């Protein structure tokens, strides 16, 4: 049978319990039509890139589905009707990914990063130029902003300035 990755976004107003019930409902539809859910991941509430239906955040859920195309058509029909579902996307894949998805691996990596601690002390080199506290360099001698350039040299092709027209 074909393999599918299906992701849907539920409104942020919906509780975690409501999202779990929605996922259970979708799973029962899949199994009722002869398919099966190989993997289910809830990515939690995440920020959206842009507003969708007046929502800035949404519950993200991934389902790996093994079933006929009729299963996908019915799941998408059910999600179109349901007001809690903001968006959904189903992609046919050649093989399903083993282990945690990229989003779950990213969450683990972020959690590991937090364990290192936040502040790592003053950085070598001090001030970075675009931050408060002065400027320590640049690509010009003596460093600094444009004010350090010095006077301009006269142009080679400089012609005498035209005389102002006088009225007689």
Swiss-Prot record:
Residues 105-158 have a biased composition (Basic and acidic residues). The gene is rpsF. InterPro entries: Ribosomal_bS6, Ribosomal_bS6_sf, Ribosomal_S6_plastid/chlpt, Transl_elong_EF1B/ribsomal_bS6. It comes from Rhodopseudomonas palustris (strain BisB18). GO terms for biological process: translation. Binds together with bS18 to 16S ribosomal RNA. Residues 97-168 are annotated as: Disordered. GO terms for cellular component: cytosolic small ribosomal subunit. GO terms for molecular function: small ribosomal subunit rRNA binding; structural constituent of ribosome. It comes from the Bacteria. Keywords: Ribonucleoprotein, Ribosomal protein, RNA-binding, rRNA-binding. Belongs to the bacterial ribosomal protein bS6 family. This is Small ribosomal subunit protein bS6. PANTHER family: MITOCHONDRIAL 28S RIBOSOMAL PROTEIN S6, SMALL RIBOSOMAL SUBUNIT PROTEIN BS6M.
């Amino acid at each position: 049978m074909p393999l599918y990755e299906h992701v849907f976004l539920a409104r942020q107003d919906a509780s975690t319990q409501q999202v779990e019930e929605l996922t259970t409902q979708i799973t029962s539809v899949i199994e009722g039509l002869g398919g099966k859910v190989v993997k289910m991941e809830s990515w939690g509430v995440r920020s959206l890139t842009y507003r969708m239906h007046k929502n800035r955040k949404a519950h993200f859920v991934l389902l790996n589905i093994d079933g006929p195309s009729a299963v996908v058509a019915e799941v998408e029909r059910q999600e179109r009707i349901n007001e809690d579902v903001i968006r959904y996307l189903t992609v046919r894949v050649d093989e399903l990914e083993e282990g945690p998805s990229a989003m779950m691996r990213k969450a683990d990596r972020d959690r590991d990063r937090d364990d290192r601690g936040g502040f790592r002390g003053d950085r070598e080199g001090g001030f970075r130029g675009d931050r408060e506290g002065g400027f320590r360099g640049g690509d010009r001698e003596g460093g600094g902003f444009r004010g350090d350039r010095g006077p301009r040299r006269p142009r080679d092709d400089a012609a005498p300035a035209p005389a102002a027209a006088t009225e007689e």
